[in-house]
């Protein structure tokens, strides 16, 4: 841990983390809040459902391209400079989106927003590692977890309330003043805590990273809509896979790589990465499946569906600071292993939901699942990063955040694919094709998709048995 900022003044960790919490909360709120407005946007701009999905795909694609090179940016620019740049991009993107008269301009606004998020998240994790000692990082990461989990949880509910009373533009207008406050707060309290080394920039590595991670994220993000047999998806996977292979080979053979893969020599980092990867797949697939189930099988309105999922999301966020303190006191094993056990139990019962399952049952099962995931996510991530030497913090945070985006895209695509296959199989044996059969087929498909989540949770539980407190 550093005691002084690069200018010589004493580091004040609390105001620094508060700056990140404000900016991060609004950034991540905006990321998910727009999901509730997609059906409205189809009518407003007279576009197809495939086109409107680009608001999500484009956002994920921008993250997938920029987050991998964030390790380089962290070594080239100061903490204050990157923070102001990130929040400025978020403000500009939000303003463009709020004023958008066309879908194309809204799309540009979303991409600009994503640039801000892609810069902010790795910077936030890297700064926490630098300003907090190891025995306090769990609590600090828990506060970050509160934002990362809580903002996406309340986003759909708040946006649903906005959409019932105002137009979709107000999702962005309401976010704008809070981002400006975060920028002003950061101008006063943000300090330079990182060391600017300005390593050599390898253009070929950046190109390979962009093609590799961008291609993979795009392929999986598009697969749910276009299908795995789509030429676009197949070409993206092939190009992305080849580029990733060449990227890894180049990083291993370079003296000063863009992304230092030596982080994988540290076993707790690698294990933590696997556990976070699995957890994110479970979260993102659940965020896709349960709204579909609630709105179709239980015939709830979008706002009501958001309310059903709100308790679990809020619990997940509120648990993060608590699990962070427990991590500091007892280490990762006391949290991660029980967390996966809780997740396995919740997912087992989610595989058995039916058309007549009550909303209360879904609230309970979703809340239990979110509690389990909160016991896994931040402890596994913090423990993994703790094992790295400070010089590898930028690379470790970049890799951790990159694979979260990749895992989210994969989890969503696989869940939708399994659900669609389950629907099709059910309809082939169903008597008739009326509304009741359609609802029953969707429910059967969602059951199958939750089996995938259950299998991932079981794999996570087995892997968690090997976790040890990093030294």
From Swiss-Prot:
GO cellular component, one term: plasma membrane
UniProt keyword list: Antibiotic resistance, Cell membrane, Membrane, Transmembrane, Transmembrane helix, Transport
Family: Belongs to the major facilitator superfamily. EmrB family.
Localization per Swiss-Prot or TrEMBL: Cell membrane
Protein name: Lincomycin resistance protein LmrB
PROSITE patterns given in the database record: MFS (PS50850)
Gene name in the database record: lmrB
Topology in the lipid bilayer: Multi-pass membrane protein
Gene Ontology terms, MF aspect: transmembrane transporter activity
